[in-house]
Amino acid sequence: MRRTRGLAAAALLVSLHCALAEEGPAALSWETLAQVSVTHQRGRYAPKFSTQLIALDKKAVTLKGFMVPFDQGLAQTRFLLSAEPAECPDCLSATAEQFAEVVAKTPLKYVIDAITVCGTLELVRDDSGALLYRLTEAVMVDK
């Protein structure tokens, strides 16, 4: 019971973060996420983000896409959000800007249909081979 109350309170705080963001969360599109190029500097590859993306870094945004879970199970706290449905692995785009890592504040129920999540956008600038985008403290705002 106490854990359920704690999870509900955490979800409410994240929802407030998205709802109370100055002027509301920005609606982010996959076209905007495609505004990135890769440069080669000092033997490493580094993303070069557009000024529009840089302005959204560390801001509350919403993004619509399809869940691609890392783990089995119905409850997901960390997953990929894809521009395209994951029903057919051969149909997915191979480009990094077509995916965003989502770290949910509370577990989200896995669904096949498109969802909209709200979270804090992080531009991933390191050369770790990770994705280019991460949404943290994310909550589902629409299925």
What do the PLM-derived regions correspond to, one by one?
Residues 6-17:
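Bacterial N-terminal signal peptides
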Residues 21-143:
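OB-fold and OB-like single-stranded nucleic-acid-recognition modules
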